[in-house]
């Protein structure tokens, strides 16, 4: 039984290289992503911190993509991010979801 009043909606956030913007937005749209938003970003954390704590190397040109997604499509989207965009490899991208419990429209 689904007890989420929003019907299992999640807020997807991902960070990837700017060169992947068009392909990512198209793939998310095809996968059912709604209200897709793209913000250009530049990291400000010191490179040593990222390397020591997470094993990551910072890059200059990034995008932050957010969208709403039906919860039952989450696994498919994460699988697509791994197979098509190689998010399972270091320094390619990071993605996570947050469950939406309430939504005002």
Predicted stretch roles:
Residues 1-105:
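Positively charged, small/polar-rich N-terminal and surface patches that mediate targeting and assembly
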């Amino acid at each position: 039984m689904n007890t989420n009043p929003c019907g299992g909606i999640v807020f997807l956030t991902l960070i990837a290289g700017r060169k992947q913007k068009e392909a990512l937005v198209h793939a998310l749209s095809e996968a059912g992503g709604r209200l897709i938003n793209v913000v250009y970003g530049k990291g400000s954390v010191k490179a040593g911190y990222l390397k020591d704590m997470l094993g990551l190397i910072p890059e200059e040109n990034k995008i932050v993509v957010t969208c709403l997604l039906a919860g039952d499509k989450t696994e498919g989207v994460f699988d697509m991010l791994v197979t098509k965009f190689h998010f399972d490899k270091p320094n390619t991208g990071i993605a996570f979801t947050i469950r939406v419990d309430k939504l005002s429209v």
